Every structure is written in structure tokens, then in C-alpha cells.
Curated annotation (Swiss-Prot):
It comes from the Archaea. It comes from Natronomonas pharaonis (strain ATCC 35678 / DSM 2160 / CIP 103997 / JCM 8858 / NBRC 14720 / NCIMB 2260 / Gabara). It catalyses: (2S)-lactyl-2-diphospho-5'-guanosine + 7,8-didemethyl-8-hydroxy-5-deazariboflavin = oxidized coenzyme F420-0 + GMP + H(+). Its cofactor is Mg(2+). This is 2-phospho-L-lactate transferase. Catalyzes the transfer of the 2-phospholactate moiety from (2S)-lactyl-2-diphospho-5'-guanosine to 7,8-didemethyl-8-hydroxy-5-deazariboflavin (FO) with the formation of oxidized coenzyme F420-0 and GMP.
């Protein structure tokens, strides 16, 4: 058995075709929670939900966000009310004292629901209401996620990286902002000066995550800084990865990134925005899968294939390369 680390869309796209390569029925997916926000009192977990919706075959695969065919009537009414009341429709980050009040899991990422700067679908909202209500009843985020997975018919463990708060904050030339404000509202346009994973020094991986990371690990072609970075910022996860076989898929072709702001984020965090930089950022990776057009010399075992991901056939091809990388390490995986 293998365990996948998932953040953003890279790993879900990889798992899109994994069923014919790995025994995915029992394959845990450990998800980034640094992107999570509390929006209008609801705890929203974008990376967790992308994995849940993909596994339930309900994901909007055009955007790789939200539920396919969902409506947005509540969101549109929130925007209309804000306009009618002449309220600022940009992200409304709550005052500092509010950021550490209320449920701990939402620390440093609380936004007002006025105008709702992130588009939340109506069916999607039901998931967030259920999650938040379970948390308020005393459930851990891991337990709430397991309940949602069961309700959606997901047959493999979907594990938040921690039940403790970790918030990804981007230091920009326009100020320090949460990742969702940087990515959704500001369209990743501000100059990046650095990245902070607030709370990571005190956060612990859950017992379920520790158990999952005892198996060989696959890191998909996700953003090394904001998708995988919050996870490896946890001392317990970083140590676990150093003690288990890890194969990572590069999100770059040499110095060209497939999508998103990974290049700017890596440069701001002190890494070359390239496959070579990914290797430096992942000292715990034992082998890599890189694109067939990528001639970057790496000092660890490397398998080359077409790493473009968009269909189940693409995911299957790259997963077979991942399996080959484990074979080269002498690691048997189911």
C-alpha cells in the first residue's frame, strides 16, 4: 500500500488514473489544511474537499474545485446584498482579536461572510455546514472528514494533515494576506516576499497521519511551497518522510511550471523555480518522476515520462512511472 500527499490539484489529478496501478480502495490521502479558511462562520477545507469530491466522482473537473453542476444562488445573493448596502466586496479579514477567538481550528484565517470573496456552491455549502457543525459538537477535523467521506461514498481514508490550526500566509508587497486572499481575490498578482505557515511549530500530525506515513509515500505534482509545504512544516511529518520511501513527481519541466504560482513562491522561499529546486525542497524524497522533456540531472533515481495530467489515462501513465521509481528503490507497493 502507498500513501498520497495531496495539496491543490496536482495529486488529485494524479490519482484520477491510479486505480489500475495501485490498490486505491485502501490508499490513504493526507491533505494540506494550510489553505483552509473560516468564511462567514463556516470552515472550508479546499484541498480536503477536492480529494473528497474527486473520489466521490462529484468534482467539477473543469475547475478542479467544487461540485460539478452546483448552483451558486446563496453566493450570488450575498454579493447582491453587499452591493445594495454599499459594502466593500473584497475579502473582509476579521480583526486580530477575532482571529484567535472561537474554535481553534480556524485561527488566523477568519473572514466575514459579507460578499463572500470565495465562490461557494449551494450543495458545496451543505458540506461546510455539516463539517462546521460536527466540529462544534466536539469532533476532530479528522473525524468530521471521515463522516463526510462515508456520506459521499468515499472508500479510502481522507486525512487532514493535522487537527491543529496551521494557516498559510503570504507576505506580499501589499501586506501579509492569507493564501486564499492572495490566490482567489488578488489572482496571485502581488510580489511575494515570503511564506509563513503560522501555527506549524506547535501543530502535530494526527495518529491517523502518522500511521499512514509508515507506508511508502507518493507526492504528486503539487505546489511544493503552499500545497506540500504546510505539511512538511510539521516536524512530525518531516521526520516521518525521512524514515519511509518517498517518490515525488515534479510540477516543473526544468524551469517551466505546469500551472499556478509555484515558480514565484519557490523563488520567494529561496529555491530555484525548477525541478532542481523541487529536489532541494524535498531532501526526504528518495526518487523522482519528471517529464520526458526534462533533462535536469538529479542525484537520486529518476524515471521520465510525459507528466502532463488531464485525463485518467494521463494519471495512469504517471502512476506507472511512480511504481517504476519504487521498483528502482527496491520497494514493493500494492
Amino acid at each position: 500500500m502507498v500513501t498520497f500527499l495531496a495539496g491543490g490539484t496536482g495529486t488529485p489529478k494524479l490519482r484520477y488514473g491510479a486505480e489500475t496501478v495501485f490498490d486505491t480502495a485502501d490508499t490513504p490521502v493526507v491533505c494540506n489544511t494550510g489553505d483552509d479558511v473560516e468564511l462567514g462562520g463556516l470552515v472550508v477545507c479546499p484541498d480536503v474537499d477536492t480529494v473528497l469530491f474527486a473520489a466521490a466522482d462529484r468534482l467539477d473537473r473543469e475547475t478542479w474545485w467544487g461540485i460539478d453542476g452546483d448552483t451558486t444562488e446563496t453566493h450570488e445573493e450575498l454579493r447582491a446584498l453587499a452591493d445594495a448596502a454599499d459594502l466593500d466586496t473584497g475579502p473582509r479579514y476579521l480583526p486580530d482579536k477575532k482571529q484567535t477567538a472561537g474554535r481553534d481550528i480556524a485561527r488566523w484565517r477568519r473572514f466575514s461572510g459579507v460578499a463572500e470573496f470565495m465562490e461557494i456552491g449551494d450543495t458545496d455549502r451543505a458540506v461546510h455546514i455539516t463539517r462546521t457543525s460536527l466540529l462544534d459538537e466536539g469532533k476532530r477535523l479528522t473525524e468530521a472528514t471521515a463522516t463526510l467521506a462515508d456520506a459521499l461514498g468515499v472508500d479510502h481514508p481522507v486525512l487532514p494533515m493535522s487537527d491543529d490550526p496551521v494557516a498559510t500566509l503570504i507576505d506580499t508587497d501589499e501586506g501579509l494576506v492569507h493564501f486564499q486572499e492572495f490566490w482567489v481575490h488578488r489572482r496571485a498578482e502581488p510580489t511575494i516576499n515570503g511564506v509563513e505557515f503560522r501555527g506549524a511549530d506547535a501543530a502535530e500530525p494526527t495518529p491517523e497521519v502518522r500511521e499512514a506515513l509508515a507506508d511508502p509515500v507518493v507526492i504528486g505534482p503539487s505546489n511544493p511551497i503552499t500545497s506540500i509545504g504546510p505539511m512538511v512544516a510539521l516536524d512530525g511529518i518531516r521526520k516521518a518522510l525521512a524514515e519511509t520511501p518517498v517518490v515525488a513527481v515534479s510540477p516543473f519541466v526544468e524551469d517551466r511550471v505546469f500551472s499556478g504560482p509555484a515558480d514565484d513562491l519557490m523563488a520567494a522561499d529561496g529555491y530555484a523555480p525548477s525541478t532542481a529546486g523541487v529536489a532541494e525542497a524535498y531532501p526526504f524524497a528518495d526518487a523522482f518522476v519528471v517529464d520526458e522533456a526534462d533533462e535536469t540531472p538529479l542525484e537520486r533515481p529518476t524515471v521520465r515520462t510525459d507528466t502532463e495530467l488531464g485525463s485518467p489515462a494521463d494519471g495512469e501513465r504517471v502512476c506507472r512511472a511512480v511504481r517504476e521509481a519504487f521498483d528502482r528503490l527496491g520497494v514493493e507497493v500494492a
